[in-house]
Amino acid sequence: KREKNMQSISIITNPTTENLVGRSHWWGAPDLPEDVPYPYVMVDDTQVVMGSTGMPKRDIHGNVIIEHGEDYPEPLTFICQIRMEDVAPFDKEGLLPRKGMLYFFAAIDYFLGDSSPIEIPLHGPVGDMVRVIYVEDVPDDVQPYDLHWEDTGESIFRPAEEITFYEGVESSETHALLSIPYQDEVSDSYPRHIALLQVEEDDRWGLHFFDCGSLYLLIRPEDLKARRFDNLQCEVFTY
């Protein structure tokens, strides 16, 4: 576990009309280079056939009838992108890269009040439901990723918010990078981990982790230094 009294990096977000391309921002569209694909999860479209009574249909042998559809890709929700140069002055331990961009994606639509066939695990390894992408050299001409819903033609992305970083305390109750969960139940369950990203509830976004809670994407400091962003644990803590 990291040394005590080390500071996290707190994140404050605010709505803005400014152009945030190439900058740190929350929500909005990620500025992914052309050779970096947007992360999707393949969904098995197998469904139980329902009858008019609301009960599953069954064949003559009493077996529930299953309808097999085609697998389809479901995009992960883009949470934020962090420009490494913005946070370098606050990263006293040198855990994060010093240049480039870090992009966070996760299947959190359910917690935003939307329906989705995919959802982050409440505890344990993130599997395919979280992707953290690090790009060391971001091209100067990078553009926001363009992705729309097929049925409406509307962008899948929420309005972008600008980010202000400042030195936080070790256990922060704000969105944060490099924090230690302030709930003992979480920090005790992951004694060798820190929160690469900590996400708190926000009524403005309709973001709620059940009655009241927090989302942690946890990583061991040695994995962070080795840039092993695939070796993450997820913890959705709720009171």
Where are these regions (language model features)?
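Short, Lys/Arg-enriched N-terminal segments with co-localized hydrophobic residues
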Residues: K1-N5
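Preference for intrinsically disordered or flexible, low-complexity segments
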Residues: M6-Y239
